[in-house]
Amino acid sequence: MSLLNCENSCASSQSSSDCCAAMANSCSAAMKDDSVSGCVSTGNLSSSFMEEIQGYDVEFDPPLESKYECPICLMALREAVQTPCGHRFCKACITKSIRDAGHKCPVDNEILLENQLFPDNFAKREILSLTVKCPNKGCVQKMELRHLEDHQVHCEFALVICPQCQRFFQKCQINKHIIEDCPRRQVSCVNCAVPMPYEEKEIHDQSCPLANIICEYCGTILIREQMPNHYDLDCPTAPVPCTFSVFGCHEKMQRNHLARHLQENTQLHMRLLAQAVHNVNLSLRPCDASSPSRGCRPEDPNYEETVKQLEGRLVRQDHQIRELTAKMETQSMHVSELKRTIRSLEDKVAEMEAQQCNGIYIWKIGNFGMHLKSQEEERPVVIHSPGFYTGRPGYKLCMRLHLQLPTAQRCANYISLFVHTMQGEYDSHLPWPFQGTIRLTILDQSEAVIRQNHEEVMDAKPELLAFQRPTIPRNPKGFGYVTFMHLEALRQGTFIKDDTLLVRCEVSTRFDMGGLRKEGFQPRSTDAGV
């Protein structure tokens, strides 16, 4: 019941005066309540701005009753006012109607002035107490209309603008968009560290001066800014013209074939050079002194003699080129022989070191963080250890470590560890197939007194190909565990120190198996022939 109706009823009946007074007090209390709460945006907006907006365009639950609808905008009354004729309107709607359409009520055309409008605080309080649904897509919350603005400030489904690309996204998605998806997010070139928007990265990568590119001729990897000099000066297989191309030799060949071409075509090049000199001679032949326009003088030198001297010099230089080429080939042969000798000595030293481990070998795998990153990026990681001997004489073995990819079936994100037999110096003096016990351990590198190593013990199975005498340098069949250790357990422990993983292999042949097994240790089943 509006305040106007209260006053009319008071004039007609004394018995209803108490009711009107109570209603007026209720309306007054509503005004105070709304002015104190400040929960709704309309209470905080200036009157000039309020006159420009219409009713509440929100979804009510249950639906809005018609008595709370503005007859002009057909939405829920905002800043409800009442006319002397008893109709309710949004303050902004009726004010605009009076100014634009004249001083009359839009419903019954009764004369209506702006100063005759008065706030309907009772209706305002009733409307602000109605339940509405959050208008943001995806949000299922409901609240009183008076709390809608506060909710929208914190609603995770409200639309906010991306400061980088100026597109709208829900608040719950904006951080992910800004960091991961926005085409205008700032990234840095991994090669030159220049910052740029992500959408420009592909274009930059195609021209980055510090990006690694592969020479199309020799396959050498260089940074882009070095490639022009590489093509022009260093690339051994880049096509180059003959040095005598200016004299008429039109052959093209790889740069590393140029010296041979010059050697094999010396006579041709000399003839071309002589012809060029002869042509120069003809163009510079002494002319008649009576022709000053040619610029010639009777005292010009003897060009024929000069040509003969140049030809003689070319012949001598040709001989020198042949001698230098022969010396270079001889030196190249000596260098190649020295390289083979050094390689042989390095192999012998490595073989001697492998024989000194006496069946206990610790494999240091450096840059292990790089291998873990490759595994996370689903790039295969397979590493082989250097060879080592079980004794002197003894069998030659090596280890193979495989980081299983996240997509691998049944063994995703596991370390696989295997042992392979190799061709060794003493194979002809040893009994085959190999028989013995092998203990594989990933060492705990903590400083604790008692270290939590991860280890497995396995017995050789002579019937498997993995333990037969190898016919090639390394037996392709291995013996070990596909699921030796999970990568999560590896990361949680202290197995990696200074970016290095330590893997220990202890081997005891059937003639030396005492003391290898720990009391009470039961080996689990292995994966053979992998």
Curated annotation (Swiss-Prot):
Pathway as given in its UniProt record: Protein modification; protein ubiquitination
Start and end residues of each MATH domain: 358-507
Enzyme Commission number(s): 2.3.2.27
Top enzyme class: transferase
Recorded catalytic activity of this chain's protein: S-ubiquitinyl-[E2 ubiquitin-conjugating enzyme]-L-cysteine + [acceptor protein]-L-lysine = [E2 ubiquitin-conjugating enzyme]-L-cysteine + N(6)-ubiquitinyl-[acceptor protein]-L-lysine
Glycyl lysine isopeptide (Lys-Gly) (interchain with G-Cter in ubiquitin) crosslink residues: 124, 327
GO annotations of cellular component type: CD40 receptor complex; cell cortex; cytoplasm; cytoplasmic side of plasma membrane; cytosol; glutamatergic synapse; lipid droplet; nucleus
Glycyl lysine isopeptide (Lys-Gly) (interchain with G-Cter in SUMO) crosslink residues: 124, 142, 461
Record's comment on post-translational modification: Sumoylated on Lys-124, Lys-142 and Lys-461 with SUMO1. Polyubiquitinated on Lys-124 by TRAF3IP2; after cell stimulation with IL17A. Polyubiquitinated; after cell stimulation with IL1B or TGFB. This ligand-induced cell stimulation leads to dimerization/oligomerization of TRAF6 molecules, followed by auto-ubiquitination which involves UBE2N and UBE2V1 and leads to TRAF6 activation. This 'Lys-63' site-specific poly-ubiquitination appears to be associated with the activation of signaling molecules. Endogenous autoubiquitination occurs only for the cytoplasmic form.
Bridged cysteine pairs (disulfide): none
Region (Interaction with TANK): 363-530
Record key words, sorted: Coiled coil, Cytoplasm, DNA damage, Immunity, Isopeptide bond, Lipid droplet, Metal-binding, Nucleus, Osteopetrosis, Repeat, Transferase, Ubl conjugation, Ubl conjugation pathway, Zinc, Zinc-finger
Entries under InterPro entries matching the protein: MATH/TRAF_dom, TNF_rcpt-assoc_TRAF_met, TRAF-like, TRAF1-6_MATH_dom, TRAF6_MATH, TRAF6_RING-HC, TRAF6_Z2, Znf_C3HC4_RING-type
Annotated zinc fingers (TRAF-type), start-end: 150-202, 203-259
Gene Ontology MF, one: zinc ion binding
Zinc finger (RING-type): 70-109
Family per record: Belongs to the TNF receptor-associated factor family. A subfamily.
Subunit structure: Homotrimer. Homooligomer. N-terminal region is dimeric while C-terminal region is trimeric; maybe providing a mode of oligomerization. Upon IL1B treatment, forms a complex with PELI1, IRAK1, IRAK4 and MYD88; this complex recruits MAP3K7/TAK1, TAB1 and TAB2 to mediate NF-kappa-B activation. Direct binding of SMAD6 to PELI1 prevents the complex formation and hence negatively regulates IL1R-TLR signaling and eventually NF-kappa-B-mediated gene expression. Binds to TNFRSF5/CD40 and TNFRSF11A/RANK.
Name this protein carries in UniProt: TNF receptor-associated factor 6
